[in-house]
């Protein structure tokens, strides 16, 4: 069973940067050593957003984007290696999630697509890469997501305390760590995605820092109820979603019925949408004693305050409080999944994804020995 230093690379639906984490991993523990966030050029970010909202590309344009993202991920890894004074030979493997551009796990031909050519990463770093983590689970009838609950269970489950882990990235997802029950998990709906999209269009800001805009506005209750009527929110688990569904076009369709509203009121309503849809799912899943929050949304004071109010009796905290960086959680999870793949261990949980069986995940892109 291979153990040693692994690197995890994650570029999530928020597109707020490439998260890169260095960790030592073996069968007994995961210890984070270092991390960095690598910027995504505006042109690449916009190209990904365009695909996610259905804009057509030629095969040439798509291939170029795949290559450019692979090079970007390699640059991020090399920056971390340089910062830590490490060589390629010091790393067992890289676990790279890739950039999701489409996720459609139901229908006649279920599929998910993450791009960022792993061959580019191997060639530019000299390190073995494990990637393409989601499609095996989909091939076995699963959603291909979320995959992180298995990692949350390994690190954060408690023998007697009812715990849940909430990741608020572009999409919010919940891991159910309930003693005596199979691990559960699913996407609750939009996390930061709609809030970020709205303030970007209205004020040219990548996100609502400290929820300043949202706190200056008032929740538009009819708009909130209109958005809450979306069938995704009442759909039973297992379920997963992404930017191809909850995007700016989705928001525009709901806003057509509310012309002339104050942009700050819309921001406040979107924050409330995220808080309400999360809290409803926590309660529908039986509630918990402790909700541990990670991801960019854990730094949104309004979201955290609203969750505490909506979930009275639950201790709402961050994963940082238990010693795991909320910013690095997902990248760390894919380093761990790479370790499991190389060890020949399953990485999915059928109780979470709905797959017909446990399976080893991903494809291995070996470096030259």
UniProtKB/Swiss-Prot annotation:
Record pathway: Amino-sugar metabolism; 1,6-anhydro-N-acetylmuramate degradation; Cell wall biogenesis; peptidoglycan recycling
Keyword terms, alphabetized: ATP-binding, Carbohydrate metabolism, Kinase, Nucleotide-binding, Transferase
Presence of keyword Acetylation: no
Binding residues for ATP: 12-19
GO molecular function: ATP binding; kinase activity; phosphotransferase activity, alcohol group as acceptor
Record SUPFAM superfamilies: Actin-like ATPase domain
Biological process per Gene Ontology, one example term: 1,6-anhydro-N-acetyl-beta-muramic acid catabolic process
Sections of the chain in a coiled coil: none
Family annotation (InterPro entries): Anhydro_N_Ac-Mur_kinase, ATPase_NBD
The keyword ATP-binding is annotated on this UniProt entry: yes
EC number: 2.7.1.170
Catalysed reactions listed for this entry: 1,6-anhydro-N-acetyl-beta-muramate + ATP + H2O = N-acetyl-D-muramate 6-phosphate + ADP + H(+)
PANTHER family with a match to the protein in the record: ANHYDRO-N-ACETYLMURAMIC ACID KINASE
Function description: Catalyzes the specific phosphorylation of 1,6-anhydro-N-acetylmuramic acid (anhMurNAc) with the simultaneous cleavage of the 1,6-anhydro ring, generating MurNAc-6-P. Is required for the utilization of anhMurNAc either imported from the medium or derived from its own cell wall murein, and thus plays a role in cell wall recycling.
Family assignment from sequence similarity: Belongs to the anhydro-N-acetylmuramic acid kinase family.
Matches recorded under NCBIfam families: PRK09585.1-1, PRK09585.1-3, PRK09585.3-2
Protein name in UniProt: Anhydro-N-acetylmuramic acid kinase
Species: Shigella flexneri serotype 5b (strain 8401)
Gene name for this UniProt entry: anmK
């Amino acid at each position: 069973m291979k153990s040693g230093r692994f690197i995890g690379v994650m570029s999530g639906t928020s597109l707020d940067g490439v998260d890169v984490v260095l960790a030592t991993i073996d069968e007994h523990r995961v210890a984070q050593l270092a991390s960095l966030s690598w910027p995504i050029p505006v042109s690449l970010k916009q190209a990904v957003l365009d695909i996610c909202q259905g804009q057509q590309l030629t095969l040439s344009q798509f291939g170029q984007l795949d290559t450019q993202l692979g090079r970007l991920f390699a640059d991020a890894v090399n920056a971390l290696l340089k910062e830590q004074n490490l060589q390629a030979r010091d790393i067992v493997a890289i676990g790279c999630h890739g950039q999701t551009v489409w996720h459609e796990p139901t229908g006649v031909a279920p599929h998910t697509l993450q791009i960022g050519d792993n061959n580019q990463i191997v060639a530019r770093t000299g390190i073995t890469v494990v990637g393409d983590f989601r499609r095996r689970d989909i091939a076995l009838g699963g959603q291909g997501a979320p995959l992180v609950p298995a990692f949350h269970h390994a690190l954060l489950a408690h023998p007697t305390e009812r715990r849940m882990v909430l990741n608020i990235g572009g999409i919010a997802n919940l891991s159910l760590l309930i003693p005596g029950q199979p691990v559960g998990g699913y996407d609750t709906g939009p996390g930061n995605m709609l809030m970020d999209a709205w303030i970007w269009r209205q004020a040219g800001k990548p996100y609502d820092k400290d929820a300043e805009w949202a706190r200056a506005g008032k929740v538009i209750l009819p708009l909130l109820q209109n958005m809450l009527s979306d069938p995704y929110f009442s759909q039973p688990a297992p379920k997963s979603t992404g930017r191809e569904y909850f995007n700016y076009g989705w928001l525009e369709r709901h806003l057509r019925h509310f012309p002339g509203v104050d942009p700050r009121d819309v921001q406040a309503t979107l924050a409330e949408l995220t808080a309400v849809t999360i809290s409803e799912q926590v309660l529908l899943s039986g509630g918990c004693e402790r909700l541990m929050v990670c991801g960019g949304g854990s730094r949104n004071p309004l979201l955290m305050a609203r969750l505490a109010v909506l979930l009275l009796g639950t201790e709402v905290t961050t994963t940082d409080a238990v010693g795991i960086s909320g910013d690095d959680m997902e990248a760390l999870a894919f380093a761990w999944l790479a370790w499991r793949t190389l060890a020949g261990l399953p990485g999915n949980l059928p109780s979470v994804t709905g797959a017909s069986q446990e399976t080893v995940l991903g494809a291995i892109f070996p470096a030259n020995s």
